[in-house]
């Protein structure tokens, strides 16, 4: 949110944001004026109705966090993967891209994270995006990815992989500083227990982070149920 606030302040209210997938099952959009009164939102549904559902597939009330579904949108199927296609829909026929979020009373959608990236540490569900959104505001951080790594007692531990800002070294001092920063602004269970550094995080030319590559490096051949 602070980054987009700065972008709008610098360029003016010309920034538009949308949420959609190549599946074509739904689309949301929001302009700068709307965003400034609904900070963090990715907009309202334009081509389908946005529904937030619980584990049972039934709709949840406003501000309750759950799986994001599109109702009444385009039909799709994953080529050669009938199981994935089936799992993307609930009993109402609404489809999901696998994201978690919530809607406010006006119907604006706020994304929390992807369900597949959720970290389960000590029985607590932790969404990496919340931790990433905080750490990226630190002046010594250029980029960050938060993943779950194996932990003997907790099941998983929160690990932040940080790309230091130019002029700063990825060393033990910076790691300690970032952990302290996180603990001062998040509950301790959400704060990273470990900070690792990379010269540059793997991103697609479009800017999409290849988080799975980072996460898989910690798990190796160990199995993980998400």
Language-model features, listed with the residues they occupy:
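A short, polar/charged loop-to-alpha-helix boundary motif
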Residues: 218-226
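Beta-strand->loop->alpha-helix junctions that form or flank phosphate-binding loops
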Residues: 16-23, 27, 42-45, 147-150, ...
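Short Gly/Pro-enriched turn/cap motifs at secondary-structure boundaries
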Residues: 38-44, 89-92
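Gly/Ser/Thr-rich phosphate-binding loop
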Residues: 1-38, 49-51, 56-59
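AMP-binding/adenylate-forming catalytic core of the ANL superfamily
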Residues: 20, 56-59, 69-72, 76-77, ...
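AMP-binding/adenylate-forming catalytic domain of the ANL superfamily
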Residues: 184-208, 226
């Amino acid at each position: 949110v602070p980054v987009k606030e700065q972008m709008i302040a610098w360029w003016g209210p010309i920034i538009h944001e949308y949420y959609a997938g190549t599946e074509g099952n739904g689309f949301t959009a929001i302009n700068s004026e709307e965003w400034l009164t609904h900070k963090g939102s990715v907009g309202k549904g334009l081509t389908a109705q946005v529904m937030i559902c619980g584990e049972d597939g039934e709709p949840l009330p406003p501000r309750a966090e759950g799986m994001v579904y599109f109702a009444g949108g385009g039909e799709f199927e994953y080529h050669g993967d009938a199981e994935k296609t089936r799992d993307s829909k609930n009993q109402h026929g609404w489809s999901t891209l696998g994201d978690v979020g919530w809607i406010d009373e006006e119907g604006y959608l706020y994304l929390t994270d992807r369900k597949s990236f959720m970290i389960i540490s000590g029985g607590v569900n932790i969404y990496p995006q919340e931790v990433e959104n905080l750490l990226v505001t630190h002046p010594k951080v250029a980029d960050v990815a938060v993943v779950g790594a194996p932990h003997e007692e907790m099941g998983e531990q929160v690990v932040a992989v940080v790309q230091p800002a130019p002029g700063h070294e990825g060393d033990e001092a910076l790691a300690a500083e970032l952990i302290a920063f996180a603990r001062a602004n998040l509950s301790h269970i959400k704060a990273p227990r470990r900070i690792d550094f990379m010269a540059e995080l793997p991103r697609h030319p479009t800017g999409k982070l290849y988080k799975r590559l980072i996460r898989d490096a910690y798990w190796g051949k160990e199995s993980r149920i998400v």
